[in-house]
């Protein structure tokens, strides 16, 4: 067990809640203690939903453990059916609830409710949230669509002549990163190709919709973390092919269009010619030359990390210096992507390891989750959020997809805005020693009363000459003092690597017994660490 203040994924029953909350007409009865009801806040506070998730908790307390907790679950399940009248119900236990070893599936079956009841058995201490969402969706699809599967060995019937091809969009859930807007973007894009969307699931689907999944010609896997298992099962049982390309970025979107056009047997030429994104021109224009070569570190779920790395490298001219994921189930995909950029993959769910890696690599931009936003802020590095888990500000009121051509536009703006433009950096360098615009100047709108505290005194050249031998002997355990001319020279170094240069120089000075850092020391340190 590990004590931590942050986790990238919750326990697997939170993943099941994401599926249930995204759907309509489905209710989740969760065998859980009072403390596990915190999960409601994820949806009402962070995602800003206007209603509670469709979850009933048994909320047993310590005093109930000496009684019949099984009867408590049966009562909660019956009351949930009587009150909400769902089309289907899923039952399971939270991580804490699983310790008392009741059987929610068997108990619910004993009630003989007149609706489908799907037992979700989630290994709470071996798996996490995304796996729980994928397993829940898979079990629902299998239980509800399974009875309509054709006999084994039968061939899929041909689509009637004149009927438009159709597909299912699989994977979007509640609490997903921009899932709501991605659905709209892909539905519009597929409509331009002459392809109808049969069912979007889990988000927005009812149990009755899940029974119709087999009617589509193929499936679009929007988010492999939650949909790949269900898509593979539909492929085996209904002979429905599914897409492999996630349309995040201009190049990936064009490849996605060609992929679905082949599956649907339609001509994509007109759509490829008519659709365009501003990203390619912006990233090639003179105004965007300051993007080229920016060092970027990427961390998040595997789908968004792999897509972001490709966009950063191929479409925006960034240099990927590190990437990783907290999704151990997709470690293979991350390792393969890391080989393309000649970097070491970071596969961990410990945010402290991620912070240490960012500090080590000194990137100029961090792309990650809400935690990477905090890490980058502490380290003074620009950051943009590309993946769940996210906080409330990343569920915007505006339309802001990540997929498709419009998604590429949104991503370009999101990534570029935290960066300092070339002209801006040039002007800061030009006026760095100006009496009004220097680094330590108080912003004019704050007035004189808000002047910052004076900086620590810096040794001048005279002080360097009068240092005695006694002072020199103590420098091994104290931080070296910066001479005024060295401090001035340091300010000429670009801001995004200035901190690293300062730390390396001070380390060099302390290791070599230099009491006062001069310009010569600064360049000696540079030569030393460049080897």
Swiss-Prot record:
GO molecular function annotation:
4 iron, 4 sulfur cluster binding; ATP binding; metal ion binding; oxidoreductase activity, acting on iron-sulfur proteins as donors; oxidoreductase activity, acting on the CH-CH group of donors, iron-sulfur protein as acceptor
* Coiled-coil ranges (or none): none
Q: Which UniProt keywords apply?
A: 4Fe-4S, ATP-binding, Bacteriochlorophyll biosynthesis, Chlorophyll biosynthesis, Iron, Iron-sulfur, Metal-binding, Nucleotide-binding, Oxidoreductase, Photosynthesis
The entry marks the following residues as binding substrate, namely: 422-423
- Domain of life (superkingdom): Bacteria
Q: Which reaction does it catalyse?
A: chlorophyllide a + oxidized 2[4Fe-4S]-[ferredoxin] + 2 ADP + 2 phosphate = protochlorophyllide a + reduced 2[4Fe-4S]-[ferredoxin] + 2 ATP + 2 H2O
Q: In which pathway does it act?
A: Porphyrin-containing compound metabolism; bacteriochlorophyll biosynthesis (light-independent)
Q: Name one Pfam family in it.
A: PCP_red
The record's listing under InterPro entries reads: ChlB/BchB/BchZ (IPR050152), LI-POR_suB-like_C (IPR013580), Nase/OxRdtase_comp1 (IPR000510), P-CP_red_C (IPR042298), Protochl_reductB (IPR005969), Protochlorophyllide_Rdtase (IPR016209)
Q: Which GO terms describe its biological process?
A: light-independent bacteriochlorophyll biosynthetic process; photosynthesis, dark reaction
Q: Which residues form the active site?
A: 287
Enzyme Commission code(s) on record: 1.3.7.7
Which NCBIfam families does UniProt cross-reference here?
Answer: DPOR_BchB
Task of the protein: Component of the dark-operative protochlorophyllide reductase (DPOR) that uses Mg-ATP and reduced ferredoxin to reduce ring D of protochlorophyllide (Pchlide) to form chlorophyllide a (Chlide). This reaction is light-independent. The NB-protein (BchN-BchB) is the catalytic component of the complex.
This protein is called Light-independent protochlorophyllide reductase subunit B
Give the source species: Rhodopseudomonas palustris (strain BisA53)
């Amino acid at each position: 067990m590990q004590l931590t203040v942050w986790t990238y994924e919750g326990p697997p029953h939170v993943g099941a809640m994401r599926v249930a909350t995204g759907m309509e007409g489905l209710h989740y009865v969760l065998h859980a203690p009072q403390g596990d009801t915190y999960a409601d806040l994820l949806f009402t506070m962070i995602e800003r939903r206007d209603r509670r998730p469709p979850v009933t908790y048994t909320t047993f307390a310590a005093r109930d453990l000496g009684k019949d907790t099984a009867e408590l679950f049966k009562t909660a399940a019956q009351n949930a059916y009587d009150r909400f009248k769902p089309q289907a119900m899923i039952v399971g236990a939270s991580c804490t609830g699983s310790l008392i070893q009741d059987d929610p599936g068997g108990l619910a079956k004993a009630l003989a409710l007149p609706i489908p009841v799907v037992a979700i058995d989630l290994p709470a201490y071996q798996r996490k949230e995304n796996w729980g969402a994928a397993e829940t969706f898979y079990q629902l699809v299998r239980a509800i669509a399974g009875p309509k599967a054709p006999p084994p060995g039968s061939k899929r019937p041909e689509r009637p002549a004149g009927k438009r091809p159709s597909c299912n969009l699989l994977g979007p859930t509640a609490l997903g990163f921009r899932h709501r807007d991605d659905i709209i973007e892909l539905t519009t894009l597929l409509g331009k190709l002459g392809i109808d969307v049969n069912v979007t699931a889990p988000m927005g689907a009812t149990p009755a919709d899940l029974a119709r999944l087999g009617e589509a010609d193929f499936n679009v896997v929007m988010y492999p973390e939650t949909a790949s298992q269900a898509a593979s099962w539909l492929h085996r049982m209904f002979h429905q092919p599914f897409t492999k390309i996630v349309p995040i970025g201009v190049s990936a979107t064009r490849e996605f269009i060609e992929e679905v056009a082949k599956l649907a047997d339609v001509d994509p030429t007109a759509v490829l010619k008519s659709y365009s994104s501003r990203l390619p021109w912006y990233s090639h224009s003179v105004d965007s030359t300051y993007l080229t070569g920016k060092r970027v570190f990427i961390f998040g779920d595997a789908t968004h990390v792999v897509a972001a790395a490709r966009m950063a490298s191929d479409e925006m001219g960034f240099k990927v210096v590190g990437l990783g994921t907290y999704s151990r189930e997709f470690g293979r995909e991350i390792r393969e992507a890391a080989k393309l950029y000649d970097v070491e993959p970071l596969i961990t769910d410990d945010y402290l390891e991620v912070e240490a890696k960012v500090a080590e690599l000194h990137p100029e931009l961090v792309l990650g989750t809400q935690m990477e936003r905090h890490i980058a802020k502490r380290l003074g590095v620009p950051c943009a959020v590309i993946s769940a888990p996210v906080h409330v500000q990343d569920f915007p009121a505006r339309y802001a997809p990540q997929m498709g051509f419009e998604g590429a536009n949104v991503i370009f703006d999101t990534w570029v805005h935290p960066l300092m433009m070339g002209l801006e950096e040039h002007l800061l360098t030009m006026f760095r020693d100006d009496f009004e615009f220097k680094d330590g100047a108080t912003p004019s709108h704050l007035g004189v009363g808000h002047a910052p505290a004076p900086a620590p005194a810096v040794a001048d050249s005279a002080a360097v000459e009068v240092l005695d031998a006694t002072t020199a002997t103590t420098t091994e355990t104290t931080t070296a003092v910066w001479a005024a001319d060295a401090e001035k020279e340091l300010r000429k170094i670009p801001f995004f690597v200035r901190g690293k240069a300062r730390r390396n120089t001070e380390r060099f000075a302390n290791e070599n017994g230099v009491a006062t850092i001069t310009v010569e020391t600064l360049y000696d340190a540079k030569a030393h660490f460049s080897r």
